[in-house]
Regions:
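Acidic, metal/ion-coordinating pockets
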Residues: 30-359
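Secretory targeting and sorting signals
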Residues: 1-33
Length: 359
């Protein structure tokens, strides 16, 4: 399906919506005005968003032999009725070489793909990429700036810089994206007051607001939402449940997350869906695929023009030995079980078909 998406640049602190070729300033959105496969479409009653977790096509110099076809096996799922496809870009698109990891660093990972790889993400169906995470500064401010430019040059919108609200149009409906991570160089989820203000500002610009959070501990032992502050390698990764509930109270229509690199459960709060981690989506030799890390899902959510939940479904994917996503695996049952264990009566009911129902 060809998508009709218009991305706009919204200056933080202003309710005005500006359509600009690009902007780059402290406290300002950097989502450039982008037309994606225009098609005549009157304002509709709903919009469908496909969302995936942590995504990189590889990391220099270990790159896939055929990057343009790396996501071909799951592209039909991304495109299945969705007008917007969102994912977390877990790294940079840059030629910069000055890495955050010094010689002999332990537990330090710096990810970069060539800037031209943005076009492969576009070809796979993506329309909006998040860069609020712990890897956007892997190659410093120069790497971050080149990443944003590369996405825009490929016709992709991005979100996640401090103070940033990214508004796209799909089927005539405005959808605002706001993304957070527990770092001062991102929109910081540890500052609940500032996050609440930003989400409320987004709600004034669009009736449909999607909040993304890069939050929680990492790894195969981090598949449960604890209801408490979570930490990883000494970092405070926030309280995902408290943040998600705050986001909905502030006006979010949908909350999605990744960062733990493993699936987590899903919950309904005040009628709105929260997906606490969509796990990994793609990473040629980047991510471990052992144990529970070899399975994930692609989430489709349909929201009304007023931002209310209408329907949702997860499609299971698994990873080959190189980290390439292919359809299949036990992701449906896995995330359904986790939701029941963690949230009880407020857990999303996930049927064997992947269809998601409110409790």
């Amino acid at each position: 399906m060809r998508k009709t998406v218009r991305a706009c640049c919204a200056i933080a602190g202003s309710a005005a919506l500006l359509v600009l070729p690009a902007c780059w300033a402290a406290g300002a959105s950097t989502a450039g005005a982008v037309e994606v496969s225009p098609r005549a479409a009157p304002a509709a009653s709903s919009v469908t968003i496909a969302a995936v977790g942590d995504t990189m096509l590889g990391t220099t110099p270990d790159l896939p032999p055929n990057p343009g076809s790396y996501l071909d096996a799951v592209r039909p799922i991304l495109d299945r009725g969705a007008q917007i496809v969102f994912g977390n870009l877990e790294g940079t698109l840059t030629t910069a070489t000055a890495s955050k990891c010094g010689a002999g660093s332990a537990n330090c990972f710096a990810f970069r793909d060539p800037p031209g790889y943005a076009r492969y993400l576009k070809q796979a169906g993506f329309t909006v990429l998040n860069d609020a995470n712990n890897h956007i500064l892997d190659f410093g401010a120069a790497g971050q700036a080149q990443t944003v430019r590369s996405l825009h040059a490929a016709g992709l919108a991005q979100t996640g810089l401090p103070g940033e609200i990214t508004v796209v149009r799909a089927r005539g409906i405005k959808v605002a994206f706001v993304a957070f991570a527990p770092y001062p160089y991102d929109a910081n989820l540890l500052n609940l007051s500032a996050a609440r203000t930003l989400i409320k500002r987004a709600r004034r610009q669009a009736r449909v607001v999607v909040v993304y959070m890069h939050a929680g501990a990492e790894g195969s032992g981090a598949d449960h939402v604890t209801g408490r502050e979570e930490h990883y390698l000494g970092e405070d990764r926030g309280n995902p449940e408290a943040f998600a509930h705050m986001a909905i109270d502030a006006g979010a229509s949908l909350v999605i997350a990744s960062g733990p690199h493993v699936l987590r459960g899903m919950q309904f709060y005040k009628g709105h869906l929260i997906a606490y981690s969509l796990g990994n989506f793609a990473g040629y030799h980047n991510f471990s695929t052992s144990g529970d890390l070899d399975t994930s899902v692609i989430l489709h959510v349909t929201l009304s023009a007023a931002g209310r939940f209408k329907s949702a479904r997860v499609y299971p994917i698994r990873f080959t030995g190189t980290g390439r996503p292919v359809p299949g695996g036990g992701g449906i049952a896995f995330t359904a079980r986790l939701g029941t264990e963690d949230f009880g009566s407020s857990a999303a009911r996930i049927l064997a078909s992947g269809v998601i129902k409110a409790p």
